[in-house]
Amino acid sequence: MSGGLDILSLKEDDVTKMLGAQTHIGSENSDYQMEQYVYKRRNDGVHILNLRRTWEKLLLAARAIVAIEHPADVFVISSRPIGQRAVLKFASYTGATPIAGRFTPGAFTNQIQAAFREPRLLVVTDPHTDHQPITEAAYVNIPVIAFCNTESPLRFVDIAIPCNNKSPHSIGLMWWLLAREVLRFRGTIPREPKWDVVVDLFFYRDPEEAEKEEQAGKESAAAIADKPADEFAAHAPTESWNDTVVPSADLAPQSWAEESASIPQYAPAPQAAAAPVADDWTTPVGADDWGQDWSNSTSQW
């Protein structure tokens, strides 16, 4: 597909990116029309895609997109969340019209509804999830470009780009490569220097993880702002130790005599009278006849 030109051949840097994003990893199942893009099958049953065929079909898709006179007539669609960010980035760099999220049925066939559109070319992320726009495009004769896995159906698909469309990194990388080749064919960017847009911008990010990272960044920034510039500035020593000593005259009297004199004097508490001591220990003092007391008390009952 490169036409014998070395400048259009697959570079080692692009192959490294594809291998890192697992673009060559297919699924265990394989459609009979996708067998021509399968390189081999591993022992665990997973099919391996031929990256050379992937690059050739990517260049063909880029040429088809460049052939459209108005870039806004190219519709890029992704119903799956992992491809929505890549679709929006691709549209922002190439001028295409993005449809990220749910596709409104009848947007290509029902002329009554307000969402009716007439695109000239359709690029979808997954033929499985984006089957509705592919079917409607077949009704109105719109060519379709699709990123297809080994198990993806090729019904109504005109240009199939074999790749791993289940991995967020693989989907982001393929949209990034397609956008770069489109801009190169248009002459917007040169081929020799690398594209200054990093591929990370096309990767899907989980909203919860992104929120956690943002919250962690805010907390770290707040901690840095609250921390003093110099750790020892807050505890700088005084010039003289005598400046920090409080005079003893303000805290205590001059002598012990004055201190004792300053203590208030209280009168001693009166002592209780001592009980009389009896000479005879056998007879307690003040003892009465207990038997007489009991008899008197019982008689009163």
Swiss-Prot record:
Keywords: Cytoplasm, Ribonucleoprotein, Ribosomal protein
Subunit structure: Component of the small ribosomal subunit. Mature ribosomes consist of a small (40S) and a large (60S) subunit. The 40S subunit contains about 33 different proteins and 1 molecule of RNA (18S). The 60S subunit contains about 49 different proteins and 3 molecules of RNA (28S, 5.8S and 5S). Interacts with ribosomal protein S21.
Acyltransferase among keywords: no
SUPFAM superfamilies xref list: Ribosomal protein S2 (SSF52313)
Cell compartment(s), UniProt: Cytoplasm
Compositional bias ranges of the Low complexity kind: 264-278
Protein name in the entry: Small ribosomal subunit protein uS2
Database matches in InterPro entries: Ribosomal_uS2, Ribosomal_uS2_C, Ribosomal_uS2_CS, Ribosomal_uS2_euk, Ribosomal_uS2_euk/arc, Ribosomal_uS2_flav_dom_sf
GO cellular component: cytosolic small ribosomal subunit
Primary location: cytoplasm
Ranges for region Disordered: 237-301
Transmembrane segments: none
Family the UniProt entry places it in: Belongs to the universal ribosomal protein uS2 family.
GO terms for MF: structural constituent of ribosome
Function: Required for the assembly and/or stability of the 40S ribosomal subunit. Required for the processing of the 20S rRNA-precursor to mature 18S rRNA in a late step of the maturation of 40S ribosomal subunits.
GO biological process: ribosomal small subunit assembly; translation
Classification via PANTHER family: 40S RIBOSOMAL PROTEIN SA (PTHR11489)
